[in-house]
Protein backbone atom coordinates (compact mmCIF):
# COMPACT_ATOMS: atom_id res chain seq x y z
CA UNK A 1 0.00 0.00 0.00
CA UNK A 2 1.33 3.46 -0.90
CA UNK A 3 2.15 6.02 1.77
CA UNK A 4 -0.52 8.71 1.46
CA UNK A 5 0.79 10.87 4.31
CA UNK A 6 2.59 13.10 1.79
CA UNK A 7 -0.83 14.07 0.42
CA UNK A 8 -2.42 14.91 3.77
CA UNK A 9 -2.46 18.60 4.63
CA UNK A 10 -2.65 21.90 2.83
CA UNK A 11 -1.49 21.69 -0.80
CA UNK A 12 -2.31 25.01 -2.50
CA UNK A 13 -2.18 25.76 -6.19
CA UNK A 14 1.04 27.44 -7.30
CA UNK A 15 0.33 30.69 -9.13
CA UNK A 16 1.94 31.71 -12.41
CA UNK A 17 4.71 34.28 -11.92
CA UNK A 18 5.40 36.76 -14.71
CA UNK A 19 7.63 39.77 -15.21
CA UNK A 20 6.48 43.14 -16.53
CA UNK A 21 6.82 41.88 -20.13
CA UNK A 22 4.56 38.90 -19.53
CA UNK A 23 7.36 36.33 -19.50
CA UNK A 24 7.72 33.66 -16.82
CA UNK A 25 9.89 35.19 -14.09
CA UNK A 26 12.07 32.43 -12.64
CA UNK A 27 13.14 34.65 -9.74
CA UNK A 28 9.53 35.24 -8.73
CA UNK A 29 8.81 31.52 -9.10
CA UNK A 30 11.61 30.78 -6.64
CA UNK A 31 10.42 33.51 -4.26
CA UNK A 32 6.89 32.08 -4.23
CA UNK A 33 8.26 28.56 -3.66
CA UNK A 34 10.38 29.85 -0.75
CA UNK A 35 7.30 31.59 0.66
CA UNK A 36 5.31 28.34 0.54
CA UNK A 37 8.10 26.52 2.38
CA UNK A 38 8.26 29.26 5.06
CA UNK A 39 4.50 29.19 5.57
CA UNK A 40 4.59 25.47 6.28
CA UNK A 41 2.21 24.15 3.67
CA UNK A 42 2.39 20.42 3.00
CA UNK A 43 2.96 20.81 -0.72
CA UNK A 44 2.15 22.65 -3.93
CA UNK A 45 0.16 21.88 -7.07
CA UNK A 46 2.24 23.32 -9.91
CA UNK A 47 1.06 24.13 -13.42
CA UNK A 48 -2.70 23.86 -13.05
CA UNK A 49 -5.37 26.48 -13.65
CA UNK A 50 -3.79 28.96 -11.23
CA UNK A 51 -0.47 28.31 -12.95
CA UNK A 52 -2.10 29.24 -16.28
CA UNK A 53 -1.07 25.94 -17.84
CA UNK A 54 -3.25 26.35 -20.90
CA UNK A 55 -1.50 29.61 -21.80
CA UNK A 56 2.11 28.60 -21.22
CA UNK A 57 4.54 26.87 -23.54
CA UNK A 58 5.97 23.47 -22.67
CA UNK A 59 9.33 25.17 -22.07
CA UNK A 60 7.79 27.72 -19.67
CA UNK A 61 6.07 24.94 -17.76
CA UNK A 62 9.29 22.94 -17.53
CA UNK A 63 11.28 25.93 -16.29
CA UNK A 64 8.64 26.78 -13.69
CA UNK A 65 8.61 23.24 -12.33
CA UNK A 66 12.41 23.10 -12.31
CA UNK A 67 12.56 26.25 -10.16
CA UNK A 68 9.91 24.99 -7.74
CA UNK A 69 11.73 21.68 -7.33
CA UNK A 70 15.09 23.40 -6.90
CA UNK A 71 13.78 25.53 -4.04
CA UNK A 72 11.30 23.22 -2.36
CA UNK A 73 12.11 19.68 -3.49
CA UNK A 74 12.36 17.46 -0.43
CA UNK A 75 10.64 20.10 1.69
CA UNK A 76 7.22 20.03 0.04
CA UNK A 77 5.08 17.47 -1.72
CA UNK A 78 5.09 18.51 -5.37
CA UNK A 79 2.25 17.61 -7.72
CA UNK A 80 2.90 18.69 -11.31
CA UNK A 81 -0.05 19.24 -13.61
CA UNK A 82 1.12 18.04 -17.03
CA UNK A 83 -1.93 18.12 -19.30
CA UNK A 84 -1.58 19.91 -22.63
CA UNK A 85 -3.76 20.13 -25.70
CA UNK A 86 -2.11 17.01 -27.08
CA UNK A 87 -0.98 13.70 -25.65
CA UNK A 88 2.64 13.90 -26.86
CA UNK A 89 3.39 17.16 -25.02
CA UNK A 90 1.53 15.91 -21.94
CA UNK A 91 3.74 12.81 -21.95
CA UNK A 92 6.84 14.98 -22.42
CA UNK A 93 5.91 17.05 -19.37
CA UNK A 94 5.14 13.87 -17.39
CA UNK A 95 8.55 12.37 -18.14
CA UNK A 96 10.22 15.67 -17.30
CA UNK A 97 8.35 15.90 -13.99
CA UNK A 98 9.41 12.38 -13.07
CA UNK A 99 13.04 13.19 -13.94
CA UNK A 100 12.86 16.03 -11.40
CA UNK A 101 11.55 13.70 -8.70
CA UNK A 102 8.08 15.15 -8.15
CA UNK A 103 5.71 13.20 -5.94
CA UNK A 104 2.88 13.03 -8.46
CA UNK A 105 1.72 14.21 -11.84
CA UNK A 106 -1.85 15.25 -12.60
CA UNK A 107 -3.95 15.90 -15.68
CA UNK A 108 -7.33 17.23 -16.67
CA UNK A 109 -9.13 15.37 -19.46
CA UNK A 110 -8.56 16.53 -23.04
CA UNK A 111 -10.42 19.76 -23.69
CA UNK A 112 -12.27 21.28 -26.65
CA UNK A 113 -13.37 18.08 -28.39
CA UNK A 114 -15.61 15.94 -26.21
CA UNK A 115 -14.06 12.51 -26.43
CA UNK A 116 -15.69 9.23 -25.44
CA UNK A 117 -14.90 8.05 -21.92
CA UNK A 118 -12.64 5.21 -23.09
CA UNK A 119 -10.49 7.73 -25.00
CA UNK A 120 -10.16 9.93 -21.91
CA UNK A 121 -9.03 6.93 -19.86
CA UNK A 122 -6.51 6.05 -22.59
CA UNK A 123 -5.21 9.64 -22.60
CA UNK A 124 -4.66 9.52 -18.82
CA UNK A 125 -3.07 6.07 -19.00
CA UNK A 126 -0.71 7.23 -21.76
CA UNK A 127 0.35 10.21 -19.65
CA UNK A 128 0.85 8.13 -16.51
CA UNK A 129 2.84 5.63 -18.56
CA UNK A 130 5.34 8.35 -19.44
CA UNK A 131 6.14 8.64 -15.71
CA UNK A 132 5.98 5.01 -14.57
CA UNK A 133 7.58 5.61 -11.18
CA UNK A 134 5.38 8.57 -10.24
CA UNK A 135 1.89 8.70 -8.74
CA UNK A 136 -0.89 9.96 -11.01
CA UNK A 137 -3.74 12.26 -9.99
CA UNK A 138 -6.90 12.42 -12.09
CA UNK A 139 -8.17 16.01 -12.21
CA UNK A 140 -11.96 16.26 -12.41
CA UNK A 141 -12.92 19.84 -13.27
CA UNK A 142 -16.00 19.56 -15.51
CA UNK A 143 -16.90 23.25 -15.39
CA UNK A 144 -13.69 24.05 -17.30
CA UNK A 145 -12.87 20.79 -19.07
CA UNK A 146 -16.37 20.33 -20.44
CA UNK A 147 -16.57 16.71 -19.33
CA UNK A 148 -17.24 15.19 -15.91
CA UNK A 149 -15.50 12.14 -14.54
CA UNK A 150 -18.09 9.39 -14.25
CA UNK A 151 -17.78 6.05 -12.54
CA UNK A 152 -17.00 3.84 -15.60
CA UNK A 153 -13.76 5.65 -16.56
CA UNK A 154 -12.93 6.17 -12.88
CA UNK A 155 -13.19 2.42 -12.28
CA UNK A 156 -11.03 1.82 -15.34
CA UNK A 157 -8.43 4.32 -14.15
CA UNK A 158 -8.07 2.92 -10.63
CA UNK A 159 -6.94 -0.37 -12.19
CA UNK A 160 -3.77 1.56 -13.07
CA UNK A 161 -1.44 1.10 -10.06
CA UNK A 162 -0.02 4.61 -10.52
CA UNK A 163 -3.41 6.27 -9.93
CA UNK A 164 -3.20 7.50 -6.34
CA UNK A 165 -5.82 10.23 -6.21
CA UNK A 166 -8.47 12.35 -7.82
CA UNK A 167 -8.43 16.14 -7.54
CA UNK A 168 -12.12 16.93 -7.55
CA UNK A 169 -13.37 20.41 -8.42
CA UNK A 170 -16.89 19.41 -9.44
CA UNK A 171 -19.87 21.04 -7.79
CA UNK A 172 -21.81 18.03 -6.47
CA UNK A 173 -20.22 17.28 -3.11
CA UNK A 174 -21.48 13.72 -3.45
CA UNK A 175 -18.68 13.18 -5.99
CA UNK A 176 -16.13 13.37 -3.18
CA UNK A 177 -17.86 10.59 -1.25
CA UNK A 178 -18.39 8.53 -4.42
CA UNK A 179 -14.72 8.70 -5.48
CA UNK A 180 -13.47 7.92 -1.97
CA UNK A 181 -15.83 4.96 -1.53
CA UNK A 182 -14.95 3.51 -4.93
CA UNK A 183 -11.22 4.27 -4.59
CA UNK A 184 -11.01 2.48 -1.27
CA UNK A 185 -8.46 2.50 1.52
CA UNK A 186 -5.34 4.44 0.63
CA UNK A 187 -6.98 6.35 -2.22
CA UNK A 188 -6.80 10.14 -1.89
CA UNK A 189 -9.49 12.63 -2.88
CA UNK A 190 -8.34 16.25 -3.05
CA UNK A 191 -10.92 19.01 -2.87
Predicted regions span which residues?
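Active-site beta->alpha loop and helix N-cap motifs at the rims of alpha/beta catalytic domains
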Residues: 2-12, 17-148
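Catalytic alpha/beta core domains of metabolic enzymes, predominantly
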Residues: 128-130, 142-191
